[in-house]
Amino acid sequence: QIPKAKYEALSTKLKAQNPMMKLLSIQVGRPQLVMRNGEPVSTSIYKQPIESRVMLRTLNLDGDRQADLRVHGGPTKAVYVYPSEHYAFWRKEFPEMDLPYGMFGENFTVSGFSETTLNIGDEFRVGSAIVMVTEPRMPCYKLGIRFGRTDIIKRFLVSERSGFYLAVLKEGEVGAGDEFLLIKRNEPSVTVND
């Protein structure tokens, strides 16, 4: 915990850069088989929105599972977060596609966050949980399956709109509409995009 005065100053600074840090939508999914080049592939990238509050656990949200634990999930990748602001960019890139929240396989679609202003190690309270920013997303070929196009992975990387992963420091209940409250700013540090 940081002293209240310092917390308020840091929170004010971060909010000035990111005015309203809010959880807009929660998506969960379980492994399912899809075809890729004539072969079955297990993936959990097809996330569905949930309306109710849900428990955020050390390894994932209740109702969410990762398909390949060698590269997805674990304590440092419990939740994948994607800023809603990026959807406007992708809708211009792919005007013919329907791009609902969760299209990138994210668990949390958020507003007011940017990979350029968040530091690795920043900690937030959301709902009754405490989470920490851990790393940017490096997409695998399953993003190409979801989009039905192989060029999305390169375009995703070049766009610098990666989203980021969270570790869960304290389990708790979360729901759409919850605000992210900064409780620890990791400075000096590197941003998610560094």
Regions found by a protein language model. Name each.
Residues 1-19:
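Arg/Gly-rich low-complexity intrinsically disordered repeat tracts
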Residues 18-143, 151, 187-194:
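Electropositive, beta-rich accessory/interaction domains or terminal extensions
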Residues 104-113, 156-166:
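Short, structured beta-strand/loop micro-motifs enriched in basic residues and often containing a Trp
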Residues 121, 176-177:
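Loop/turn positions that initiate beta-strands
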Residues 133, 166-167:
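Short beta-strand His + acidic residue motifs that chelate non-heme Fe in jelly-roll/DSBH
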Residues 146-158:
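Short beta-strand-turn/beta-hairpin segments enriched in glycine/proline and small hydrophobics
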Residues 171-176, 182-184, 189-190:
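Conserved SET/PR domain catalytic loop and adjacent active-site segment
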